[in-house]
Structures are given as structure tokens and as C-alpha cells.
Amino acid sequence: MKIARVCGTVTSTQKEDTLTGVKFLVLQYLGEDGEFLPDYEVAADTVGAGQDEWVLVSRGSAARHIINGTDKPIDAAVVAIIDTVSRDNYLLYSKRTQY
């Protein structure tokens, strides 16, 4: 899994039938020190994440099975909203201090 920040949404009125009702988010990936990387991806949202929240992203075949246990044509899915991230006893992110 990877860590990313929600930086936007994608709206699509015409899509593959199995994607009906799926919410899509624009994500910006983060580096090991919590810095924002110039890497973006669109992911299906399974947890109701909002703007600027840090999230865990599952990719590949695991992401395709997360939504209702069926194969859907997605490459990435948001599977958790992060409360805190720390590394080497240093707090990189806390949702509590962000809001």
C-alpha cells in the first residue's frame, strides 16, 4: 500500500456499467518523509475520504476486489483514512492537528 493525500475529485456521467455509484478521487502520493511527490493517480473511494485527508491506497488486483468483492476495471482504491503517521518516533502527520 501507499500513502497519498486527497487533492480532488473526478466526476464522470458516462462510465462502464460496473462503476456506477463509485466515487473517484484524485490523489497525490507522499514520500517517506511526508513530502508531496509530483505523482498523481485517480482511485476509487471505498471509505468516504475528503479533501486534504491522508489515505492508504491499495493498487492492482487487490484494488479490483475491494468494492463488493467483484472485478471492476480499477487500478487503485482508497481503503483507509489515516489518523496518524510516524516514523522513527517522529510524528509526520496527525489528522487531529490538520482539522
From Swiss-Prot:
InterPro entries: CcmL, EutN_CcmL, EutN_CcmL_sf
Localization: Carboxysome
Single biological process term from Gene Ontology: photosynthesis
CDD domains with a match to the protein in the record: EutN_CcmL (cd01614)
Keyword Oxidoreductase part of the UniProt annotation: no
Pfam families noted in UniProt: EutN_CcmL (PF03319)
UniProt domain BMV: residue ranges: 1-83
Taxonomy, superkingdom: Bacteria
Family of this protein: Belongs to the CcmL/EutN family. CcmL subfamily.
PANTHER family (UniProt xref): BACTERIAL MICROCOMPARTMENT SHELL VERTEX PROTEIN EUTN, ETHANOLAMINE UTILIZATION PROTEIN EUTN
Known partners and oligomeric status: Homopentamer. May interact with CcmK2, this occurs at very high CcmK2 concentrations. Interacts with full-length CcmM.
The protein's name: Carboxysome shell vertex protein CcmL
Source organism phylogeny: Bacteria, Bacillati, Cyanobacteriota, Cyanophyceae, Acaryochloridales
Gene that encodes the chain: ccmL
